Amino acid sequence: MKMSIWTPPRLLELAGRSLLRDQALAMSTLEELPTELFPPLFMEAFSRRRCEALKLMVQSWPFRRLPLRPLIKMPCLEAFQAVLDGLDALLNLGVRPRRWKLQVLDLQDVCENFWMVWSEAMAHGCFLNAKRNKKPVEDCPRMKGRQPLTVFVELWLKNRTLDEYLTCLLLWVKQRKDLLHLCCKKLKILGMPFRNIRSILKMVNLDCIQEVEVNCKWVLPILTQFTPYLGHMRNLQKLILSHMDVSRYVSPEQKKEIVTQFTTQFLKLRCLQKLYMNSVSFLEGHLDQLLSCLKTSLKFLTITNCVLLESDLKHLSQCPSISQLKTLDLSGIRLTNYSLVPLQILLEKVAATLEYLDLDDCGIIDSQVNAILPALSRCFELNTFSFCGNPICMATLENLLSHTIILKNLCVELYPAPRESYGADGTLCWSRFAQIRAELMNRVRDLRHPKRILFCTDYCPDCGNRSFYDLEADQYCC
């Protein structure tokens, strides 16, 4: 027979629950309630939908910030509305209450354990430790002191319509725009009619936005509607663009004009450090227009699964804004028929800073590899190098490994299984592959002690995935 140990609730917990049940008692007591009781009682009130208690607690909140996002993951729109009603009561007051410290309603999806820290403190009585463990959160300096309340939010526009929480919030903000500042640092557009996107962007201070991801199947005419908003995001640090297509109804002249309108917006983005472009078809033959408008030194540059001309690569190697790159990802760009001299020049230019290099699936063949080896061997800060999906032979692979031997910071290396590993029909010959891995293991360990080297196969025709193997026999790495 199993015996369970029942832990009775602490006196503070019982007092808090009693307070939530008695509205009249709550009104008279909150002004004198110890600060450490507010977070656990607020969680209790929110989960139990004690709306009147929530309104009162918001008005007496003893911290300058209310991080509400972790709590609204619970399906409780009624409790969320009660919090907004409590804020309304505060904003409508002519004179601030003695205890009013609340300045920030934080709806960002941040990794912060505010509620967990305080609930654990409640359980163990370690309130002093809870105060010490709170992490400072960056404010919005551009609006400091202008409005009594700042609302931080991350906008994920992924459905045809907004979720009920965001709809409720934006309607509330729209009706009180003179009393508060809506600050959005991260904007992610994954699918929504642009007329809806436009109405939301008009409510947000675009100068606050630091990260933007657009992952929609937009054609150029839709991109032109977004372009003016991009130019106003003057503090943008990270931009991700995916699946931008050229409509077949757009003439070459129209395409050039649209690309010019879009790329000239980069002249205004003087804080941009990270640029990611995946499956962006309008770059072909126009990369120089974008690069010439960059006014900052990029730290991250990713151009993947795009079609580029050889002239585009030449312009990339000559761009002054890429000389301090830490990450360069050109995976999925077909280079088979191109000279790799521009890539060699590019690697020479970033050798002092480059830490991550991805050249997967570029179709680089044996005769092209030698062009980049001297520059690659001078990338002394490199810690990750990926070269999967390039059809090279055993001799070329050995030559490549011998040139990376002096890269002491290299921790992860990914290479393709050499062509000798495959049969005439293109399928992997397992016995031959095992023999090649054993030969490579002996060769590499004669040269150096690698931290991690993986060899990958071609994509499986059945599952569409690759398999990765390290140098040890029969060891598969997912």
Swiss-Prot record:
GO terms for cellular component: Cul2-RING ubiquitin ligase complex; cytoplasm. Keywords: Leucine-rich repeat, Repeat. GO terms for biological process: negative regulation of apoptotic process; negative regulation of cell differentiation; negative regulation of DNA-templated transcription; positive regulation of cell population proliferation; proteasome-mediated ubiquitin-dependent protein catabolic process. LRR repeats lie at residues 99-126, 181-205, 206-232, 233-268, 269-294, 295-326, 327-347, 351-378, 379-403. GO terms for molecular function: ubiquitin-like ligase-substrate adaptor activity. Belongs to the PRAME family. PANTHER family: PRAME FAMILY MEMBER 11-RELATED (PTHR14224:SF19), SIMILAR TO PREFERENTIALLY EXPRESSED ANTIGEN IN MELANOMA-LIKE 3 (PTHR14224). This is PRAME family member 4. It comes from Homo sapiens. The gene is PRAMEF4.
